[in-house]
């Protein structure tokens, strides 16, 4: 009798499952993350493109570390190469991508756009000398350069930021005409400001991107290829996988650790979610909840020190303090954010009666200790930045070298594990193979880092245009006066209005660009109302980030729902509930800047703020989940939320009132449990 041809082995089934998961991940990334909607190259064309991208990454590293040229030369050169790399990688539409094909119009746009920026770099001194008296040819070059940059932004960033930039450019043009300028003079002034000065395309956002962000994107690409993501997931599994609802807690911890490296909420949701979301569903969590947990935790990765995300470097520049101080100030808010998510997933697990992963299925501690060398580049970066031994750029460069060394060691150890006998010959062969693998990894990391830099650089350039328009028109002053008059003496209303602005403008806009817009418009409003500088910028930074999980345009939540096969809107609502701490914490440090280590008079002051904040977040999360020790009815849930919010209001009296409410609810739950136990007997 012949064997059944349809019979599949467990290994074959696992392979098919992994292929299906990989296909789902690719599909979701293409749908929600524009960075992955790139051209398809193969053969010699792929090699040429890879070499160009790797060389561009090396150019960025070398120019950042060693160049002494003035910004008007360095930054246009950088943007010229971004234009070249952008059109080589991003097609006009993701629906019409032909392998190994670059349309003639893309070649035209690529060459002309890059030429505009290179012309500026080569004639920088002339442009500075001419100032607003630039000639018609210069106006034409600036117009073409901006229009081609706008098209590249449409391809790799998206439409929302273009709508904002377009409206502001039209307003700036109208503003010039309203003061009596001719059509040409208005165009000349705007193009000069936006294209030929450091108040536009090559403004602070692009300068910070060129100086710091690109290096850290490249560092993140190297770090990911050392296998650190798998290490973080294994570590989170060992740490929390055994507890009630363990897979969800694993998702929170691993996404926090991986998210601070990747800097992309959507990308991190998809990559770590492809592992954690199926685990959560298998444990018993609803698909909407599983996708929401991953989205909320991955989004929080951008506020997780030490790397945080690209916007943190911009914040350091805008506030005028070292990046290390920004990272330190972000510690307590980040702890509160992830504690809030952790509490929510724990209460949900208890409510559903979910178990954890059996301990015998968890990674062994000895294996984790063996692989802990993978985090050495990250440890080195933290030490260099915190000690001030090196500049940020040099710290990133040294950390990249450390990541290369760790990658080589990792490849070598993996090759050795594959050999049964360790003779001189087998060790030499393993070393030779590891060197080859490491060289390929370095090449791939440089290419990935350069690709990642395109989207961020273009978003920063558009943010520079937006900031330039706001400066030219004086729109910031108008907004400040309008909000201050509307809020009056009710500063809390000012915070609410600012929060709404940040979330609306942040929908579909990359975090870097969103923060730049908020730093130019909304942060000055809060400062004018009397809030501290650092607290104001952290406030807009936080609400710019949570736009990724706030419906109706919650890209990270929708990416999580695609992996979980759940309803996108329900997933977004669940993600917002889980990340409730992100909506509360900014109000806490707005009224208590001590949480950001500002104006601290004693350690006990910080301890009191943190304890009351933790209790408040716990109570609010419990009220939203409807569970502490047992299910709660709606009146008790509302009371728990009120008690939690009362704890979050500054003041001893409010703290005591909130504490009494929360303690009373817990006491009631304890008594109800005892009564239920007696009745069961």
List the predicted regions and their residue ranges.
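Long, contiguous bundles of hydrophobic transmembrane helices that form the permeation core
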Residues: 2, 6-47, 53, 328-452, ...
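Conserved, well-structured core domains of diverse proteins
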Residues: 1-132, 139-143
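Membrane-interfacial loop-to-helix junctions in multi-pass transporters
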Residues: 136-140, 199-212, 238-252, 283-289, ...
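Core transmembrane alpha-helical segments of multi-pass membrane transporters/permeases
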Residues: 147, 151, 155-156, 164-181, ...
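Transmembrane alpha-helix interface/packing and boundary motifs in multi-pass membrane proteins
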Residues: 220-224, 255-264, 296-302, 463-467, ...
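Membrane-interface helix termini and inter-helical loops of multi-pass transporters
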Residues: 67-68, 124-132, 188, 192, ...
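Hydrophobic transmembrane alpha-helices that form the pore/transport pathway of multi-pass ion
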Residues: 233-301, 307, 311-314, 320, ...
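Membrane-water interface regions at transmembrane-helix termini and the short interhelical loops
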Residues: 38, 63-68, 89-100, 126-127, ...
């Amino acid at each position: 009798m012949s064997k059944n041809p349809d019979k599949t082995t467990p290994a074959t089934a696992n392979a098919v499952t992994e292929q299906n998961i990989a296909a789902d991940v690719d599909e979701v990334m293409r749908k929600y993350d524009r960075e992955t909607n790139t051209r398809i190259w193969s053969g010699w064309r792929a090699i040429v493109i890879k070499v160009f991208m790797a060389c561009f990454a090396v150019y960025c590293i070398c120019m950042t570390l060693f160049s002494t040229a003035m910004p008007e030369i360095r930054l246009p050169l950088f943007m010229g190469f971004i234009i070249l790399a952008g059109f080589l990688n991003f097609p006009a539409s993701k629906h019409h991508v032909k392998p190994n094909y670059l349309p003639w119009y893309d070649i035209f746009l690529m060459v002309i756009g890059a030429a505009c920026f290179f012309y500026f770099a080569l004639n920088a001194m002339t442009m500075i000398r001419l100032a607003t008296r630039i000639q018609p040819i210069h106006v034409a070059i600036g117009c073409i350069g901006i229009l081609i940059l706008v098209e590249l932004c449409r391809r790799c960033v998206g439409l929302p930021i273009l709508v904002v930039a377009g409206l502001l450019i039209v307003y700036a043009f109208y503003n010039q005409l309203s003061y009596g300028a001719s059509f040409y003079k208005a165009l000349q002034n705007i193009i000069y400001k936006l294209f030929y000065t450091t108040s536009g395309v090559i403004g602070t956002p692009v300068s910070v991107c060129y100086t710091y962000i690109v290096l850290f994107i490249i560092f993140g690409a190297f770090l990911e290829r050392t296998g650190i993501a798998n290490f973080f997931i294994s570590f989170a599994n060992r740490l929390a996988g055994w507890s009630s609802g363990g897979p969800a807690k694993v998702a929170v911890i691993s996404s926090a650790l991986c998210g601070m490296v990747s800097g992309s909420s959507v990308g991190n949701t998809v990559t770590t979610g492809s592992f954690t979301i199926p685990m959560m569903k298998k444990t018993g969590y609803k698909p909407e909840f599983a996708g929401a947990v991953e989205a909320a935790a991955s989004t929080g990765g951008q506020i997780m020190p030490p790397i945080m995300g690209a916007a943190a470097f911009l914040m350091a520049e805008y506030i005028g303090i070292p990046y290390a101080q920004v990272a330190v100030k972000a510690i307590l808010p980040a702890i509160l954010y992830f504690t809030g998510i952790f509490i929510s997933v724990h209460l949900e697990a208890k409510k559903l009666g979910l178990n954890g992963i059996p301990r015998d299925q968890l990674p062994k501690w000895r294996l984790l200790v063996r692989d802990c060398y993978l985090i050495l580049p990250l440890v080195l970066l933290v030490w260099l930045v915190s000690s001030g031994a090196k500049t940020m750029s040099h710290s990133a460069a040294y950390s990249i070298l450390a990541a290369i060394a760790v990658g080589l060691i990792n490849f070598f150890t993996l090759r050795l594990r594959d050999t049964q006998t360790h003779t001189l010959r087998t060790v030499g062969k393993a070393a030779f193979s590891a060197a080859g693998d490491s060289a390929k990894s370095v090449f791939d990391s440089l290419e990935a880092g350069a690709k990642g830099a395109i989207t961020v650089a273009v978003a920063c350039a558009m943010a520079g245009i937006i900031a330039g328009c706001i400066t030219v028109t004086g729109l910031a002053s108008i907004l400040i006066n309008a909000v201050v008059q509307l809020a009056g003496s009710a500063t809390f209303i000012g915070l609410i209005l600012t929060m709404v602005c940040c979330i609306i403008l942040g929908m579909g806009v990359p975090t870097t660009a969103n923060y730049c817009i908020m730093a130019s418009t909304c942060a000055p409003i809060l400062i004018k109302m009397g809030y501290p500088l650092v607290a104001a910028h952290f406030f807009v930074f936080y609400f710019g980030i949570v736009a990724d999980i706030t419906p109706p345009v919650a890209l990270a939540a929708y990416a999580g729902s695609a992996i979980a096969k759940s309803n996108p809107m329900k997933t977004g609502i669940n993600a917002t509930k889980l990340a409730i701490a992100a909506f509360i914490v900014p109000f806490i440090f707005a009224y208590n800047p001590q949480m950001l280590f500002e104006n601290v008079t004693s350690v006990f002051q910080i301890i009191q703020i943190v304890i009351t904040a933790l209790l408040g977040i716990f109570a609010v999360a419990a009220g939203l989940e409807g569970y502490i020790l047992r299910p709660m009815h709606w009146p008790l849930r509302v009371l728990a939320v009120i008690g939690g919010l009362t704890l979050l209001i500054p003041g001893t009296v409010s703290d005591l009132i909130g504490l009494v409410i929360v303690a009373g609810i817990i006491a009631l739950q304890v008594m109800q449990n005892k009564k239920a136990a007696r009745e069961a007997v």
